[in-house]
Amino acid sequence: MKFVLLFGVLLLTLFSYSSAEMLDDFDQADEDELLSLIEKEEARAKECTPRFYDCSHDRHSCCRSELFKDVCTCFYPEGGDNEVCTCQQPKHLKYMEKAADKAKKFGGKIKKWFG
């Protein structure tokens, strides 16, 4: 019985050691992969696609407006078989930006009155 217990403890120790080694290898691989993804992201982030330009090459490359990032919207033009993708600002975000701009202007007027 002591032999079985000793053998079990030894087996458990070896198993946990090998698992730790495998996890270290996986962590190192994840770190390397993460670093390469970050480098690609930095390289891609240098140039953005302006509004109403083609974004089919990279659908996450649209530029930011004052508050929000534009969205790559794809559609099929009438009578066309090819998909067209352009960077556009959704209407609800457009209205939110207009409201924020008006609020800023109104805040400036209040500051002048009570300033």
From Swiss-Prot:
> Signal sequence span per UniProt?
1-20
This entry's Gene Ontology molecular function terms read: toxin activity
Point out the propeptide residues. 21-44
Do the record's keywords include Hydrolase? no
Where, by tissue, is this protein expressed? Expressed by the venom gland.
GO cellular component terms attached to this protein's record? extracellular region
Domain of life, per lineage = Eukaryota
Q: Which PROSITE patterns match?
A: SPIDER_CSTX
Cysteine pairings via disulfide bonds: C48-C63, C55-C72, C62-C87, C74-C85
Recorded hits in Pfam families, A to Z, give: Toxin_35
Q: Which InterPro entries match?
A: Spider_toxin_CSTX_knottin, Spider_toxin_CSTX_Knottin_CS
TM regions (residue ranges): none
How does the entry describe the domains? Answer: The presence of a 'disulfide through disulfide knot' structurally defines this protein as a knottin.
Tell me the protein's name: U3-lycotoxin-Ls1a
UniProt source species = Lycosa singoriensis (Wolf spider)
